[in-house]
Swiss-Prot record:
GO terms for cellular component: cytosolic large ribosomal subunit. This is Large ribosomal subunit protein uL13. PANTHER family: LARGE RIBOSOMAL SUBUNIT PROTEIN UL13M, RIBOSOMAL PROTEIN L13. Belongs to the universal ribosomal protein uL13 family. SUPFAM superfamilies: Ribosomal protein L13. This protein is one of the early assembly proteins of the 50S ribosomal subunit, although it is not seen to bind rRNA by itself. It is important during the early stages of 50S assembly. The gene is rplM. Keywords: Ribonucleoprotein, Ribosomal protein. InterPro entries: Ribosomal_uL13 (IPR005822), Ribosomal_uL13_bac-type (IPR005823), Ribosomal_uL13_sf (IPR036899). Part of the 50S ribosomal subunit. One of its GO terms (molecular function) is mRNA binding. One of its GO terms (biological process) is negative regulation of translation.
């Protein structure tokens, strides 16, 4: 029997809504990355964008285990000598764009090539509970009920 390989006509993209409130960051990012890649589908083909569109709301209320909220650092370089800078996860979550913590966690779980960049365009992350994608009628995925370890009280 020949191995099934999907064609562009076989790809069917759905919209999935995930509420990140009280969910552990790494576990959320793993679930989202697998959905974006399409690994949850029986027709998964590694070299094609098979994944669904994912909407993550309440990204500012995501949880971290241990001391990661205070100790985890996000580094960047200004391009000047001695220009390495960083912010802690706590500073990012309390700043102007707290959704970037979830974006960066998922981005680092997706392959770093043109296919990965294409898959990341199917992810929308919002800090609050509101999102402008009601017209797409997203199906709700309750990450908290999948595994008791997925959630953590503040």
């Amino acid at each position: 029997m020949k191995t099934f390989t999907a064609t562009p006509a076989d790809i069917e993209k759905k919209w999935i809504l995930i509420d990140a409130e009280g969910v552990v960051l790494g576990r959320l990012a793993t679930i989202v990355a697998n959905i974006l890649r399409g690994k949850n589908k029986p027709t998964f083909t590694p070299h094609m964008d098979m994944g669904d569109n994912v909407i993550v709301i309440n990204a500012d209320k995501v949880q971290m285990t241990g001391n990661k909220r205070a100790d985890k650092r996000y580094y960047w370089h200004t391009g000047h000598p001695g220009g390495v800078k960083f912010r802690t996860a706590e500073q990012v979550l309390e700043g102007a764009h707290p959704e970037r913590v979830v974006l960066k966690a998922v981005e680092r779980m997706i392959s770093r090539n043109s296919l990965g960049r294409q898959q990341m365009t199917n992810l929308r992350v919002y800090a609050g509970a509101e999102h402008p994608h009601e017209a797409q009628q997203p199906t709700v995925l309750d990450v908290k009920s999948l595994n008791p370890k997925n959630t953590r009280s503040a």
